[in-house]
Design a protein with these regions (language model features):
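Catalytic machinery of carbohydrate-active enzymes
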Residues: 1-270
Length: 270
């Protein structure tokens, strides 16, 4: 079995996408199966699929072109009509196709090198709470003042150290919070997705408004408080111990009392 995985950047040109498909075919021959797992129906995806010409194509977002297997119909209904969690939809899709049954969970393997370098810094803290303050948009990102309120609320409930999880855009905010509060820390290494995942993997609790961080918590079964600006049934918290706080369109409108209640519930159940 030859498995080819790849990432296409949003800014890739149509020629680059066509060339990528051609190169795969030239190097490996006609693929038996193309699993197209993007969440959006777009022209570039269609061009890649048509150029690749795999014998069978899977997707679950309701595309009806003849190139897609009829086996996709029920899985697409789960996604488009029933709005089922995405891992559940794909587990169903693969079972429909005759693959061995798999659990409907997220997976994010990490190398020993990444785990070791993060654990080296975190080891002295013992148990810690991983606090992520950034979502995929400004509306889903906590302002500095609300972040301060959240930290104060956490520290009123527990004396467990807090580690700020952040991307490149959140570094200044993370530095400011670490400087202002006792028992609040950040990783000194440059931020990366894998390093953030390593922090989430070992956390006592994760707190996040971002679904990508939430998926990490689900993958590692880390107890989590998920904060949604706009709740989406396709992206639920899937850890055994979790609470969700639904805010509305702007994440800064979070109720601190509701947040504290969710945090208490998670702490009590661990």
């Amino acid at each position: 079995l030859t498995l080819v995985t790849m990432t296409m950047q949003d800014h890739a040109t149509l020629k680059e996408i066509k060339d990528l498909a051609k190169n795969i075919t030239l190097q490996y021959g006609t693929p038996d199966l193309c699993i197209e797992a993007m969440r959006k129906k777009n022209l570039k995806t269609m061009i890649f699929i048509s150029q690749l010409k795999a014998k069978t194509n899977f997707q679950v977002v309701g595309l009806t072109m003849k190139c897609y297997s009829p086996l996709c119909k029920n899985a697409s209904r789960m996604d488009q009509n029933l709005r089922a969690p995405v891992p559940m939809t794909w587990a169903f899709m693969m079972r429909e196709a005759g693959f061995p049954a798999v659990r409907s969970i997220y997976e994010l393997p990490l190398s020993d090198d990444v785990l070791d370098e993060v654990r080296e810094e975190m080891r002295s803290l013992g148990s810690y709470i991983a606090l992520n303050l950034e979502g995929s948009s400004q509306e889903r990102t906590f302002s500095l003042s609300i972040a301060e309120n959240l930290i104060a609320k956490i520290q009123s409930e527990t004396d467990i150290p807090i580690v700020i999880v952040y991307g490149p855009k959140g570094e200044d905010k993370a530095r400011a919070l670490v400087d202002c509060y006792n028992n609040v820390y950040r990783l000194s290494l440059s931020p990366s997705i894998k390093r953030s995942a390593a922090i989430i993997k070992d956390a006592y609790i994760a707190i996040t408004p971002d679904t990508s961080i939430l998926h990490m918590a689900s993958a590692y079964n880390t107890p989590v408080v998920a904060i949604y600006a706009d709740y989406k049934t396709r992206w639920p918290a899937m850890a055994d111990v979790s609470e969700s706080v639904v805010v509305g369109q702007k994440i800064d409108n979070i109720s601190l009392d509701e947040f504290a209640k969710a945090l208490k519930s998670v702490l009590a159940r661990i």
